[in-house]
């Protein structure tokens, strides 16, 4: 472990403080940091009902992330932070698109999130019906 730490500290010592300050104050750093909201939101949406997934928007975000992954790879110097952000978003949006297609068209895999939400809905409806009946008597 100390060998890894030694290599990391050697790497940081090779570059001056001014270079790091320039990097952390540039759009090469803050652009990807701001973009991390997209994959984080998509990952959070994996636990939501698939009825709420927008197919066209998810497809647009897949295309957007694939284009900017290519851009981040080809720009000089390479922006690996931006690449990682869009790779994560591409993966999360791909999972969402898979859920959307399965839920609306294929019905191959039972979505555990949708199943759990439907069970909660049935329990609430049953409790509501029982409450209405008890008030009627």
Swiss-Prot record:
Keyword Transport tagged: yes
Record keywords: Membrane, Mitochondrion, Mitochondrion inner membrane, Transmembrane, Transmembrane helix, Transport
Compartments, record wording: Mitochondrion inner membrane
Main location: mitochondrion
One record GO biological process: mitochondrial pyruvate transmembrane transport
Molecular-function GO terms, alphabetical: pyruvate transmembrane transporter activity
Listed name of the protein: Probable mitochondrial pyruvate carrier 1
